[in-house]
Amino acid sequence: MSLNLNDKKAVVAEISAKVASAQTIVVAEYRGIQVGHLTQLRAKARDQGVYLRVLKNTLARRAVEGTAFASLASEMTGPLIYSISDDAVAAAKVISDFSKTNDKLVVKAGNYAGKPLDKAAVTALANIPSREVLLAQVLGMMLVPVASFTRGLAALAAKKAEGAEPVAAAAPAAESTEAAAE
């Protein structure tokens, strides 16, 4: 389907708006993927909050022109699907995970916060846990000293309680031995 000039301007404006708020863009070649698989990829992307779209490369180049993602323009050749995300790892994770199960989807390049990424860097970015998981891990690490301190206090209290009973029991025995000695 051919787009007229107004349609092209609308597409560039839409993509430019997405790119302006994005942290990560991942570009993948989708040559030979069946429509059903592409639909599954779109559903996974939608669930993760990732904007996924097949675009004309010239329109995509115009959309990233003058942004931190301009370095991707040199990689925009061939049939590409663009994955754009506000989350740092979501776009890379969706594309990378899907490419593991479908060898026809090939990660070509990416860009994170203005830094160009090659295929290996996109895969490494995809292996980073999500923001929520990282926050949970940090919180868990912060709670470890508190939990250790609490267990230490409980053990100390238990030890003192055990130590107090034998001393209290030994005191009447000592009194009885003193009374017997007199």
Curated annotation (Swiss-Prot):
This is Large ribosomal subunit protein uL10. The keyword Cytoplasm does not apply. HAMAP family: Ribosomal_uL10 (MF_00362). Keywords: Ribonucleoprotein, Ribosomal protein, RNA-binding, rRNA-binding. InterPro entries: Ribosomal_uL10, Ribosomal_uL10-like_sf, Ribosomal_uL10_bac, Ribosomal_uL10_bac_type, Ribosomal_uL10_CS_bac. Forms part of the ribosomal stalk, playing a central role in the interaction of the ribosome with GTP-bound translation factors. GO terms for cellular component: large ribosomal subunit. It comes from Janthinobacterium sp. (strain Marseille). One of its GO terms (molecular function) is large ribosomal subunit rRNA binding. Gene3D superfamilies: 3.30.70.1730, 6.10.250.290. One of its GO terms (biological process) is translation. Belongs to the universal ribosomal protein uL10 family. Part of the ribosomal stalk of the 50S ribosomal subunit. The N-terminus interacts with L11 and the large rRNA to form the base of the stalk. The C-terminus forms an elongated spine to which L12 dimers bind in a sequential fashion forming a multimeric L10(L12)X complex.
